[in-house]
Amino acid sequence: MVRVGRAMLAAAMMAAMGKPVAAEVLDATYRGTMVCDKLPFTSNKMREAIEVTISSGAARYNHVVRLRNTAVEAVAEQGTGTVDGQKIQLQGTWKSGSRQYEAKYSGSFVRRSARLKGTQTWTDGGKTATRACAGAIKRPLKPFLPRDKK
């Protein structure tokens, strides 16, 4: 019984001395998908790829735009953002013909991924519509990241 008590005390001490688990936001390319609500001129919700590159606290991203079930738009949504600790903020735009939108997404990193939420505010022929988007991005495991050149 004394042995069990000592073992539990030792385990508790080791756990208390360990570092807290926090996300390690590394300079890397994070890939994932965003699901956005239906627009008045689309038939369904849209699930599209997003790629976010983080370098020294700055972010830039590309997000695929699809207005129909088959064709991807020639121009992708593009934007920039910031990483502050475990938080990420992204802002971008897209335009094609008379349609355009402004996007804002934000989220938090947990381990090697981040969950994103935000909105796209569309303008089409003088009408405005806002839709919600949510998704996630994830970086490769650390051993698979490009190595720094020395």
Locations of the language-model features?
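Bacterial N-terminal signal peptides that target proteins for export
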Residues: 1-9
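Hydrophobic helical h-region of N-terminal Sec-dependent signal peptides
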Residues: 9-17
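Sec/Tat signal peptide C-region and signal peptidase I cleavage site
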Residues: 19-23
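Central antiparallel beta-sheet cores of small beta-barrel/beta-sandwich binding domains
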Residues: 24-111, 117-150
